[in-house]
Amino acid sequence: MGKTLTIVMLVFVSMAGWMFGADTGSIGGITNMRDFQSRFADRYNPVTDTYSYSSARQGLITGMVNVGSMTGCILSSPLMDRIGKRVSIMFWTIVYLIGIILQVTAVPSWVQIMVAKIWTGLAIGALSVLAPGFQSEVAPATLRGTIVTTYQLAVTGGIFIAACINMGTHKLHKTAQWRVSMGINLLWGIIMFIGISFLPESPRYLIAIGKDEEALDIMCKNNVLPREHEIIQTEYHVIKTDCEAEMAGGPATWGDILGADIRYRTFLGLGVMSLQQLTGDNYYFYYGFEVFEGTGMNSPYLSALILDAVNFGCTFGGLFVLEFFGRRMPLIIGGVWQSITFFIYAAVGNRALTRKNGTSNHRAGAVMIVFSCLFIFSFAQTWGPAAYVIVGESYPIRYRSKCAAVATTGNWLWGFLITFFTPFISDSIGFKYGYIFAACNLCAACIIFLFAHETKGLTLEEINELYLSGAKPWMPRPENLGQAAKQQQEVLEKSRGVQGESAAHLENVDNEGMEDTSSNDITSSTSSSEGRAKPESNYVDEQDRYA
């Protein structure tokens, strides 16, 4: 398998995000479809011949997928440690398909809809841990941010396509209105299952469990290089040495993720993923129909479609933003931008939307839609993709599955709290709710400035060194970091220049003491190069960093 094909297949893994987005994007429109309301709503107004939901039922139907997702995040870790990421992804995809079938057959019980949402959420939550983690481990360091961003791109693509499907089905008759929107999600799961079946396991995982030969074969195929090549040798020995050091203490327990060497990153990942929800994006995506109806828009389906199109289109920018500008700056600027847009949205909605005679001010409504789109413009390129990138690349392999599970669980917890309580809060304070999200976005920008390191261009092993180095996040990172990645890139460029010459004839690029890799004994464990040496005096426990 060549590198290009590897990248294409890694994008297939992003179908996990598409499945999540399709669920998020469809439920808001489905709950507003006439046939669905007639079967599952608990209120009926005979005067207007309309159905509606109590706040509790609305929150349960919409938000219970997040409860399942929280559980799925935790369950993903032990299964992944046993059978690996690739097979785990295939297993959870089957769980997802069963959940969709349960949703489509849920007539006439709204409880079955709720249970089916929980079941589907199990798969969505597990895949939200597995997919970005798998991409981070297999992707080249220079492309990791872009490739992991495809997960969020797939989320927004799923949301947009679901909105298009809702737009086309909401005028159909009887159960076809909502069953088509739900049932088409089976297609995404099938595509995901087929795609992942062709993808190899993560070399890092294989080395961690002692399958070095298989890992080497995959590394050679991914890079289209022989085993003796310097890139393969360097990458293998770096991963091997780090895996041995990390696994020396045995498999990590849940308590170990609070140890001195990883505690800081455990809470950072949890905080970043929680703050991603607290930015308020799902306020629009889950309740966009109610929001736009409140602004006086005649066609909430069309309004939601416009917002979802902006979300999807702008996420393409995120593919480049995180590689060109790094992780920190986009998150900081994004948080400030989103705070401003939410503040204006809330102020206009609270003060200008409703006239004294009770009618809606359509100009004010248009302003609110514009600032909603400006919020999405920022979120789609910053907090949407970057949160998954940070979680996917911040943890060493010994802790990765459990730390990522905890971080993503925080995301789903806040997702549930926001989706469940939004109907109650909106009924109580209306558009003033936006002030809360404005404050959360500003807080998020401050937390990134104080606690998150810039990791652009570093290998996963170098990121681990960075977090252990004691460097302040807002200061320039240590100069010795990133040398291995640069050396590998130099070797790759030279290997392309000689069009397949033997590695023995390539110029030796290891000027920093990188180990000689010409030996045939490539599976023996060797020390890292001097450029990657870790003097004890340069490293501190993470909890002492800000002492």
Curated annotation (Swiss-Prot):
<dbReference type="InterPro" id="IPR050360">
    <property type="entry name" value="MFS_Sugar_Transporters"/>
</dbReference>
<feature type="transmembrane region" description="Helical">
    <location>
        <begin position="87"/>
        <end position="107"/>
    </location>
</feature>
<feature type="topological domain" description="Cytoplasmic">
    <location>
        <begin position="454"/>
        <end position="547"/>
    </location>
</feature>
<feature type="topological domain" description="Cytoplasmic">
    <location>
        <begin position="326"/>
        <end position="328"/>
    </location>
</feature>
<dbReference type="InterPro" id="IPR036259">
    <property type="entry name" value="MFS_trans_sf"/>
</dbReference>
<protein>
    <recommendedName>
        <fullName>Probable high-affinity hexose transporter ght8, mitochondrial</fullName>
    </recommendedName>
</protein>
<feature type="topological domain" description="Mitochondrial intermembrane">
    <location>
        <begin position="134"/>
        <end position="144"/>
    </location>
</feature>
<keyword id="KW-0597">Phosphoprotein</keyword>
<feature type="topological domain" description="Cytoplasmic">
    <location>
        <begin position="166"/>
        <end position="179"/>
    </location>
</feature>
<feature type="modified residue" description="Phosphoserine">
    <location>
        <position position="519"/>
    </location>
</feature>
<feature type="modified residue" description="Phosphothreonine">
    <location>
        <position position="526"/>
    </location>
</feature>
<feature type="transmembrane region" description="Helical">
    <location>
        <begin position="305"/>
        <end position="325"/>
    </location>
</feature>
<dbReference type="InterPro" id="IPR020846">
    <property type="entry name" value="MFS_dom"/>
</dbReference>
<dbReference type="Pfam" id="PF00083">
    <property type="entry name" value="Sugar_tr"/>
</dbReference>
<feature type="topological domain" description="Mitochondrial intermembrane">
    <location>
        <begin position="350"/>
        <end position="363"/>
    </location>
</feature>
<feature type="transmembrane region" description="Helical">
    <location>
        <begin position="180"/>
        <end position="200"/>
    </location>
</feature>
<feature type="transmembrane region" description="Helical">
    <location>
        <begin position="433"/>
        <end position="453"/>
    </location>
</feature>
<feature type="topological domain" description="Mitochondrial intermembrane">
    <location>
        <begin position="426"/>
        <end position="432"/>
    </location>
</feature>
<feature type="transmembrane region" description="Helical">
    <location>
        <begin position="329"/>
        <end position="349"/>
    </location>
</feature>
<keyword id="KW-0812">Transmembrane</keyword>
<keyword id="KW-0496">Mitochondrion</keyword>
<feature type="transmembrane region" description="Helical">
    <location>
        <begin position="145"/>
        <end position="165"/>
    </location>
</feature>
<feature type="modified residue" description="Phosphoserine">
    <location>
        <position position="528"/>
    </location>
</feature>
<keyword id="KW-0472">Membrane</keyword>
<feature type="topological domain" description="Mitochondrial intermembrane">
    <location>
        <begin position="22"/>
        <end position="86"/>
    </location>
</feature>
<feature type="topological domain" description="Cytoplasmic">
    <location>
        <begin position="108"/>
        <end position="112"/>
    </location>
</feature>
<feature type="topological domain" description="Cytoplasmic">
    <location>
        <begin position="385"/>
        <end position="404"/>
    </location>
</feature>
<feature type="transmembrane region" description="Helical">
    <location>
        <begin position="364"/>
        <end position="384"/>
    </location>
</feature>
<feature type="region of interest" description="Disordered">
    <location>
        <begin position="482"/>
        <end position="547"/>
    </location>
</feature>
<dbReference type="InterPro" id="IPR005828">
    <property type="entry name" value="MFS_sugar_transport-like"/>
</dbReference>
<feature type="modified residue" description="Phosphoserine">
    <location>
        <position position="529"/>
    </location>
</feature>
<dbReference type="GO" id="GO:0005351">
    <property type="term" value="F:carbohydrate:proton symporter activity"/>
</dbReference>
<feature type="modified residue" description="Phosphoserine">
    <location>
        <position position="527"/>
    </location>
</feature>
<feature type="transit peptide" description="Mitochondrion">
    <location>
        <begin position="1"/>
        <end position="21"/>
    </location>
</feature>
<feature type="compositionally biased region" description="Low complexity">
    <location>
        <begin position="517"/>
        <end position="529"/>
    </location>
</feature>
<comment type="similarity">
    <text>Belongs to the major facilitator superfamily. Sugar transporter (TC 2.A.1.1) family.</text>
</comment>
<dbReference type="GO" id="GO:0005886">
    <property type="term" value="C:plasma membrane"/>
</dbReference>
<keyword id="KW-1133">Transmembrane helix</keyword>
<feature type="transmembrane region" description="Helical">
    <location>
        <begin position="113"/>
        <end position="133"/>
    </location>
</feature>
<keyword id="KW-0809">Transit peptide</keyword>
<feature type="transmembrane region" description="Helical">
    <location>
        <begin position="405"/>
        <end position="425"/>
    </location>
</feature>
<feature type="modified residue" description="Phosphothreonine">
    <location>
        <position position="523"/>
    </location>
</feature>
